[in-house]
């Protein structure tokens, strides 16, 4: 707190974001609307979904994650790069976990080829657990029994609390870990990317959601300042955000290697970290936690923002009569 003015906190965003969207009359939620393709007509964008519906709007922002369909059509740059690790997740009632864990902090356990992160949610009533280990294959396929055996082997020398955490995992909730190399440009015309769709990163700096939130605020400012020129707005947005998010991606890879190192490499990392004091560590992270310098734009009043957003709101049209 003395260095960065604010404490490190964990926020369960799911319900907060959903409730905020439901309260906003200019937002329409369309569940189970899987996007199949889009068409940029230069004056508007049409988005087609797999169930045959078509939506039209002033622009399209693809915030559809690391396996973004928007990105696939926009740049056709292939799949994310798996790094050989698999992640397992679960959220359990805090009372179900009998081992002694700290209830008010984010905790990381790390070793050669594996790590576990756990932290409390909802005022300490829930415990979020993420366990990661290196596999011999990048495939997400495999039955629960096989994964259980691999986990037991990877964590065979781990602390008893780590083994107790492993017992709480839902092995059906798994995901191959990976990222993408940073890119300079995230848009073409009236279509842009945001968050993991633009700059997916490893979890070692815990900045995926934070970068997406910063993206959103920066993008809103750039659109508000561009007077309807979406190509210019998206260009200003990516210029403002590309270097910062690229650094997060590259530093996350570096930290990931430190987490999972072994042998003499691990000893070197220990020596390097041991040479740093608390103040040194904080200064090493200052570029990240001191915040992002947003573009200097005049933000419109909320009444003006609502009027502008209403003009840009998407409309649903008959797919058969839409422009293609």
Predicted regions, residues:
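Short helix-loop capping/hinge motifs at secondary-structure junctions, enriched
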Residues: 94-101, 138, 225-226
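A short coil-to-beta-strand element that immediately follows conserved catalytic motifs
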Residues: 82-84, 101-105, 126, 149, ...
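C-terminal helical "tail/cap" subdomain of flavin- and related membrane-associated enzymes
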Residues: 206, 221-324
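Active-site substrate-recognition segment that forms the wall
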Residues: 104-139, 148, 155-156
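Short beta-strand or tight-loop elements
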Residues: 31, 43, 112-114, 173
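Conserved N-terminal helical subregion
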Residues: 1-93, 136-152, 291-312, 323
């Amino acid at each position: 707190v003395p260095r960065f003015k604010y404490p490190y906190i964990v926020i369960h965003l799911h319900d907060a974001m959903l409730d905020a969207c439901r309260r906003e009359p200019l937002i329409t939620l369309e569940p189970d609307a899987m996007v199949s393709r889009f068409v940029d007509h230069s004056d508007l964008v049409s988005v087609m979904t797999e169930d045959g519906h078509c939506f039209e709007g002033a622009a399209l922002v693809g915030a559809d994650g690391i396996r973004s369909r928007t990105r696939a059509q926009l740049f056709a740059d292939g799949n994310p790069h798996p790094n050989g690790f698999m992640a397992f997740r679960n959220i359990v009632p805090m009372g179900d976990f009998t081992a002694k864990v700290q209830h008010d902090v984010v905790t990381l356990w790390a070793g050669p080829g594996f790590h576990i992160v756990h932290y409390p949610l909802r005022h300490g009533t829930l415990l979020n657990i993420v366990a990661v280990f290196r596999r011999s294959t990048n495939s997400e396929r495999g039955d629960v029994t096989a994964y259980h055996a691999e986990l037991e082997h990877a964590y065979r020398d781990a602390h008893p609390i780590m083994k107790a955490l492993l017992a709480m995992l839902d092995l059906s909730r798994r995901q191959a870990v990976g990222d993408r190399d940073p890119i300079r440009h995230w848009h073409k015309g009236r279509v842009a990317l945001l968050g993991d769709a633009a700059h997916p990163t490893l979890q070692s700096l815990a900045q995926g959601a934070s970068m997406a939130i910063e993206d959103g605020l920066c993008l809103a400012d750039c659109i508000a300042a561009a007077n309807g020129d979406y190509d210019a707005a998206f260009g200003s947005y990516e210029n403002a955000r590309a270097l910062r998010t690229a650094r997060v991606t590259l530093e996350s890879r570096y930290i990931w290697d430190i987490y999972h190192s072994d042998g003499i490499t691990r000893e070197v990392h220990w020596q390097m970290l041991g040479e740093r004091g608390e103040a040194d560590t904080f200064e090493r992270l200052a570029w990240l936690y001191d915040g992002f310098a947003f573009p200097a734009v005049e933000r419109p009043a909320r009444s003006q923002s609502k009027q502008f957003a209403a003009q840009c709101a998407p409309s649903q049209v008959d797919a058969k009569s839409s422009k293609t």
